[in-house]
Amino acid sequence: MAAERSFIAIKPDGVQRGLVGEILGRFERKGFKLVGLKQLTPSRELAEQHYGVHKERPFFGGLVDFITSGPVVAMVWEGDGVITSARKMIGATKPLEAEPGTIRGDLAINIGRNVIHGSDAPETAEFEIGLWFNPSELSDWTPSDQTWRVEG
């Protein structure tokens, strides 16, 4: 059985504030495996597809403007329960409601600048990974310390 994968993106505010290493480190220390990584400034088309579920919401235009305003670090992380675990690590969408110890709880204040995005379900992860990455951009590899990360 293939391990679960999740799409995680460090938004322009996180990149501009120099938080990439801090965030990557949290996922690595948790024991998840990085299988895709790139930095890009998203096109408007990509942003509109990514946030398509919010198209009719009043904040849609501002959200698209923000995510296309600078570089984003797009990642695919793999591991048992990575989607649920990543959401817990990220914290509540509204940073002031996020628990201390979460990425947003520690590193963000405002909902419009909440540093990071993470897939919320397997179907969403599959869609987002396919939107942001070509299959050839994902690495299938085994960390040398794999037996120390997970059983079996």
Swiss-Prot record:
Annotated metabolic or biological route of this protein: Purine metabolism
Positions annotated to bind ATP: 11, 59, 87, 93, 104, 114
Assigned GO CC terms: cytoplasm
SUPFAM superfamilies: Nucleoside diphosphate kinase, NDK (SSF54919)
Signal peptide: none
Gene Ontology molecular functions: ATP binding; metal ion binding; nucleoside diphosphate kinase activity
Cofactor: Mg(2+)
Family: Belongs to the NDK family.
Function: Major role in the synthesis of nucleoside triphosphates other than ATP. The ATP gamma phosphate is transferred to the NDP beta phosphate via a ping-pong mechanism, using a phosphorylated active-site intermediate. (Microbial infection) Catalyzes the phosphorylation of dZDP to dZTP, when the bacterium is infected by a phage that produces the substrate for the synthesis of dZTP (2- amino-2'-deoxyadenosine 5'-triphosphate), which is then used by the phage as a DNA polymerase substrate.
Subunit structure: Homotetramer.
Name by which UniProt lists this protein: Nucleoside diphosphate kinase
Organism: Synechococcus sp. (strain CC9311)
